[in-house]
Amino acid sequence: MSRIGKQPIAVPSGVTVNAQDGVFKVKGPKGELTVPYNTELTVRQDGDQLLVERPSDAQKHRALHGLTRTLVANAVKGVSDGYTINLELRGVGFRAKLTGKALEMNIGYSHPVIIEPPAGVTFAVPEPTRIDVSGIDKQLVGQVAANVRKVRKPDAYHGKGVRFVGEQIALKAGKAGATGGKGKK
């Protein structure tokens, strides 16, 4: 039995679930999500819990069991609590602001970088050097946050750029002879 797949999924109050024809629909206070799943697996509700069951111990079913359970659990958590990923800007003059719903960043290029959020994702800028990416779809929020980070990845020598809050950047040592002073005669 899959260690992940056999765990029940708690359904909070205010969240309704419906699984039929290979599509799992979950509706909650923050919105509505649909998750497709393999019809060989069954998703059933038992009181305030959801259970994902597989028909056999075949390799394919074992692989899909844990995956489906995690996708369904992410959808339930997304519509009840939502997901937020925090990013920070490091560098002299690096700052961000909201222009309407779009994120505008000055991150060392000769022009500001503007990123439009896809449907279901919102940006927030609590400080000029911090960006919050939030939404109900965990995969989409993570992908958008990765796309924002990709615009200016942290530099290997100084750590300047866009990074996740708490991310440790392994900095490289500079050139050994870069201490200054007079050159060779």
UniProtKB/Swiss-Prot annotation:
Part of the 50S ribosomal subunit. SUPFAM superfamilies: Ribosomal protein L6. GO terms for cellular component: cytosolic large ribosomal subunit. GO terms for molecular function: rRNA binding; structural constituent of ribosome. The keyword rRNA-binding applies. The lineage of its organism: Bacteria, Thermotogati, Deinococcota, Deinococci, Deinococcales. Keywords: Ribonucleoprotein, Ribosomal protein, RNA-binding, rRNA-binding. It is located near the subunit interface in the base of the L7/L12 stalk, and near the tRNA binding site of the peptidyltransferase center. This protein binds to the 23S rRNA, and is important in its secondary structure. InterPro entries: Ribosomal_uL6-like, Ribosomal_uL6-like_a/b-dom_sf, Ribosomal_uL6_a/b-dom, Ribosomal_uL6_bac-type. This is Large ribosomal subunit protein uL6. HAMAP family: Ribosomal_uL6_B. Belongs to the universal ribosomal protein uL6 family. Coiled coil: none annotated. GO terms for biological process: cytoplasmic translation. It comes from Deinococcus radiodurans (strain ATCC 13939 / DSM 20539 / JCM 16871 / CCUG 27074 / LMG 4051 / NBRC 15346 / NCIMB 9279 / VKM B-1422 / R1).
